């Protein structure tokens, strides 16, 4: 899987002379953004304990928000790197599909981004991860306003910020009696997933599940 990821990055024309995580030299063009030592750390690391998330029946996490995985997520988001987002999706694909087969959701979706973020990046990174994983999804959410990034916000500030997540009016009828899986990149305080789950349940969804690429420590 690691070699596949490296080849995908190279195939996309994305290759640097130094590893963007540790700065070590990259000797092979197949390595793309990361040295071999760092790529070896790109493996699932499920938390030993899952804290309860309000309105969410169950959820899964691929790994910890640290090291190479954290760098990959940040690079995909803030380097506006759609190919890297899709490549990361391919890495997590087997684990995401395993969970999908277990819960058998009727509908899979992910958070929306506001217009400011969309125009600065040119894409929604979680949508591109799902495309990379080969997972069909429906755009259920939108985000209003021009708020900045949520990283570094306090819990109270996050609770206010997540109010900008709304449902798309045209899909509300699709949610009634549906089992919904929400995919997101990082689980931190749980404010975002709680808001999204509450929204879909409020219009008749039967159950909400979640999958996160990483969980913050």
Language-model regions: role of each:
Residues 1-217:
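Glycine-rich phosphate/pyrophosphate-handling loop used in enzymes and phosphotransfer proteins
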